[in-house]
């Protein structure tokens, strides 16, 4: 899979790669899940929500204070180390480019308060209507069909953020899109990859962000996978 991400040679193949990654549980430009339709509780519907960032909150990209600045510095260093562990060159510069992309995305994301507002977040669209959230790089109807041919309508939690993210990704260089996908893949699959990758992923997300000093012992992690 990692070789497939590295081999992407045009933006035309990006949408399909995003769908394939999502099916593997790897975070992409948007999140999605199947849940109850709040206005028709007997129905289930696919919901799309804003995504595209590696830090868990938009404020971590945007707030100007020492704590957030420290997190941003640590995050870029983490991305650089992950790229280097994947055998990639120029990790620092490429990590900075991914950080710049994600900062642009954070600027169009909804605040935590708005994103959790059930009324603002209920926006239903037919499959055909989701074309308005597409860009030349991301074909939303095609992606939804690839996720499931049964999808005929969806809820989009933060429409302006989803469209804004699609537009930002369309303007981004292919190399940056690939690097971001590679990094999301390394993080999402970290526990199946060499310990050096898993340890680095935990050092940032577990220790730096959450304060957990160390990973569980190997036997405990193994039990968790059974």
Go through each PLM region and give its residues.
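Noncatalytic, helix-rich "gating/capping" subdomain that lines the substrate-entry/channel surface
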Residues: 1-226
């Amino acid at each position: 899979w990692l070789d497939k991400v590295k081999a992407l040679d045009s933006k035309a193949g990006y949408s399909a790669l995003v769908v394939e990654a999502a099916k593997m549980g790897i975070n992409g430009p948007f999140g999605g899940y199947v849940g109850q339709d709040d206005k028709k509780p007997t129905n289930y519907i696919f919901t799309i929500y804003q995504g595209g960032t590696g830090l868990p909150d938009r404020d971590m990209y945007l707030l100007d204070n020492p704590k957030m600045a420290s997190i941003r510095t640590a995050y870029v260093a983490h991305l650089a180390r992950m790229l280097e562990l994947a055998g990639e060159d120029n990790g620092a510069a490429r990590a900075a480019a991914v950080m710049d992309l994600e900062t642009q995305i954070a600027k169009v994301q909804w605040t935590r308060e708005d994103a959790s507002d059930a009324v603002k977040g209920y926006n239903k669209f037919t499959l055909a209507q989701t074309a308005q959230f597409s860009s030349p790089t991301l074909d939303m109807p095609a992606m939804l069909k690839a996720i499931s041919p049964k999808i005929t309508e969806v809820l989009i939690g933060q429409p302006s953020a989803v469209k804004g993210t699609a537009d930002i990704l369309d303007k981004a260089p292919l190399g940056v899109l690939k690097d971001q996908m590679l990094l999301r893949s390394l993080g999402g699959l970290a526990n199946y990859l060499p310990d050096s990758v898993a340890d680095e992923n935990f050092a940032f997300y577990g220790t730096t962000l959450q304060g957990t000093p160390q990973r569980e012992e190997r036997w405990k992690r193994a039990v968790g996978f059974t």
